[in-house]
Amino acid sequence: MVAVGAANWPGHDDGVRFYEERVLPRIINVACGKQLEPLRRRVCAGLTGDVVEIGFGSGRNVPCYPPAVTRVAAIEPADLSWKLAARRVTAAGVPVQRSGLDGQALPFPDSSYDAALSTWTLCTIPDPAAALREVRRVLRPGATLHFLEHGLAPDEPVRRWQRRLDPLEKRLAGGCRFTEPIAELLTTAGFTITELDAFYQKGVPKFTGAYSLGTALSP
């Protein structure tokens, strides 16, 4: 659900661009706010060393970084999201630097990070498979990707609703999709899933609340 620069894709008119650049980041900042902090703390637990976070958004994960994190490279294309993150970045106990705009083309050498973090990002990034290949490339062997994503539900009746609603969701939420198969994407990209909690988030419709939270090992 993170806004990852959909307004820069071909075919966007000025009205859509204004919505996705000036309005949507504010909506996401509120919608993915305090109520999700317990999940953020779960997914951030165990992060250590130099971390790359794709889909940084407005920095909602920053207060949840554990003390073992030494530095964070934030990948975030939306200028407004980065502005909304300013206070959290300033208050962070570790250096956080906006280091790139596109999770599909990370500006780092191979094997340069100890861990990676992705929360509500693979649903929106145009080519999640490419992004995961890039994350794997920049992670050191044996490093861990921590993920918290919503995606394709385990139950077919819910999946049918997800497929029906996907076109509307893409339009309203900057390209976000309900139907990404998170575990399959990870394994296809070469990761080994070491922990996976797949569940329906309480308080939201199942078609948008099919969550996958866990860790995956880089080869």
What does each model-identified segment do?
Residues I27-D50, R60-C64:
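Conserved alpha-helix/loop element of class I SAM-dependent methyltransferases that forms part
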Residues V52-A105:
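Class I SAM-dependent methyltransferase SAM/SAH-binding core
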Residues L101-A116:
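A short acidic, Gly/Pro-enriched loop at the edge of an enzyme's catalytic core
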Residues D114-D127:
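A short SAM/SAH-binding and catalytic strip from SAM-dependent methyltransferases
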Residues A129-P141:
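A short glycine-rich, Lys/Arg-flanked "PGG" loop and its adjoining helix->strand segment in the class I
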Residues G142-H150:
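Conserved beta-strand signature within the Rossmann-like core of class I S-adenosyl-L-methionine
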Residues G174-G190:
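Short alpha-helix
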Residues F191-P219:
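Core SAM-dependent methyltransferase catalytic element
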